[in-house]
Curated annotation (Swiss-Prot):
Recorded family membership: Belongs to the UPF0210 family.
Annotated source species: Sulfurisphaera tokodaii (strain DSM 16993 / JCM 10545 / NBRC 100140 / 7) (Sulfolobus tokodaii)
Any Pfam family hit: DUF711
The protein, known as: UPF0210 protein STK_02450
């Protein structure tokens, strides 16, 4: 891969003045070889990946130093724990969780993801055991993450899985609930937690990369002062191309040094609580005074289309979620607009129709009850099914009332407690079973 002198200078400016970084380099590794009906045997087999994780951590640090690029997090995704718990006892899931947490800490891995299950049409022993142990698994670890895929365009939506999930997250503190999500159509190669897991059909081990560049897009728009929407689209597209090329360079270098496959650059624009690193701020730079105002959806649609076209030109290894993230707490401007009243749950659902964020990193007051949260999650997963999109809900139940917030610090930012509608939905949420797949399923063959 060759780079022109002009391109190198531009990237240098992006790195030093516009907060461009690599959000995550994620090692995705098959761990199914360690499945056994004896916990001790499983743990002993899993020990084989320790040296691999140690090499990965060292190589990522070396690549970051070599290119002068800030790599924010090192992450690992493993095969879904559901498959281990098909043959192990329920309580063994906690021991697996604690072991994965220890091995991540030992090797300076920020997150290890894969305490996950697929239950979009019903439960197996393993998927139900993951759900039942989710509270303890997260409460007894610090780096473990995982998700429940409770809906898909192919299969429909498992309402019973949503109910159990809500019961579990109401029992865990905010920091722990930030490490789990419930999703529709989850991809097999996401570099982001908590959706990351080593999916079916993936190679034995592979590298997936997530980039972060909202500040770069914002600066490009401000510099260029576009006069037409076509010019605006083109500016974003060109900036996205350069951001993606950086992700490709880092991912391929790490993979080559490890002697494994490079699979995915996730094109998602991932914000952070830092000033100047906000997706919402891009929308406001495009001309919407406050995100949430009318026109926000159209502006986000332009942003998404341009990012995807620019990114797809820069790499043939597109994967993961590849859209914009608008996690409320992790985006400083989104958080402020939520407190000001410009962003509510239905605004987030509307914006999710053109991006892959869903309801992400938003607080709900426990005092408003579980039924409304179940209804909210079913809304966002239904949108994912109907549009055949990757969507999810990462909701943070909090004891505080709507309108308040708590600050988790770091990448997690300020959790705003949004008000749920004061409407009784208990009759609807009392139904059991699953919502059948839609007519969209017939379009897939």
């Amino acid at each position: 891969m060759k780079y022109s002198a002009e391109e190198i200078i531009e990237v240098y400016q992006m790195l030093n003045e516009e907060d461009l970084d690599i959000r995550s380099v994620t090692l995705s590794i098959n761990t199914l070889f360690a499945i056994s009906d004896d916990l001790d045997k499983s743990l002993k087999k899993l020990e084989e990946i320790n040296n691999f994780l140690e090499r990965f951590s060292k190589i990522v640090d070396e690549v970051g130093s070599k290119y002068g690029i800030r790599i924010v997090t090192k992450r690992v995704s493993v095969s879904p724990i559901q498959f281990f718990l098909e043959v192990l006892d329920e309580k063994d899931g906690i021991e697996l969780a604690k072991y994965l947490d220890r091995i991540a800490e030992r090797n300076n891995i920020d997150y290890i993801s894969g305490y996950s299950a697929f239950a979009d049409k019903g439960f197996t022993r393993g998927s139900l055991r993951v759900l039942k142990t989710l509270t303890d698994a997260l409460n007894k670890t610090k780096r473990l993450a995982g998700m429940i895929n409770a809906a898909s365009t192919m299969s429909g939506m498992n309402i019973d899985a949503i109910k159990i999930f809500v019961d579990r997250i109401f029992e865990i503190p905010p920091e722990s609930s930030s490490r789990t999500a419930i999703m529709s159509n989850v991809p097999p190669d996401s570099p982001f937690v908590p959706s990351a897991h080593h999916g079916m059909g993936m190679p034995e081990a592979t590298i997936n990369v997530a980039v972060s560049g909202p500040g770069v897009i914002k600066a490009a728009i401000e510099r260029s002062k576009p006069k037409t929407l076509q010019e605006l689209h083109d500016i974003i597209k060109r900036a996205a191309f350069k951001i993606t090329r950086l992700g490709e360079l880092v991912g391929r270098t790490v993979a080559e040094n490890m002697g494994i496959n490079f699979t995915t650059v996730d094109l998602s624009l991932a914000p952070s609580p830092k000033v100047g690193d906000s997706v919402a701020e891009i929308i406001e730079t495009m001309g919407i005074e406050k995100i949430g105002g009318h026109g926000s959806l159209a502006a986000l649609a332009i942003l998404m289309d341009a990012v995807k076209k620019g990114g797809a030109m820069a790499t043939s290894s597109v994967g993961g979620l590849s859209s914009a993230f608008i996690p409320v707490s992790e985006d400083a401007v989104m958080s402020e607009r939520s407190l000001e009243g410009y962003i509510d749950f239905y605004t987030l659902i509307a914006l999710s129709s053109v991006c892959n964020s869903g309801i992400d990193m938003v607080g709900v007051s426990k005092s408003q009850g579980k039924d409304k949260v179940i209804g909210l999650i079913s809304d966002i997963l239904a949108l994912g099914i109907s549009l055949n999109k990757i969507l999810g809900a990462r909701i943070i139940p909090i004891d505080s009332p709507p309108g308040s917030y708590i600050d988790l610090g770091g990448l997690l930012g300020k959790i705003v407690v949004m008000k749920l509608k004061d409407v009784n939905v208990s009759k609807f949420t009392s139904y059991r079973g699953f919502i059948p797949s839609t007519v969209k399923r017939l379009e897939l063959g």
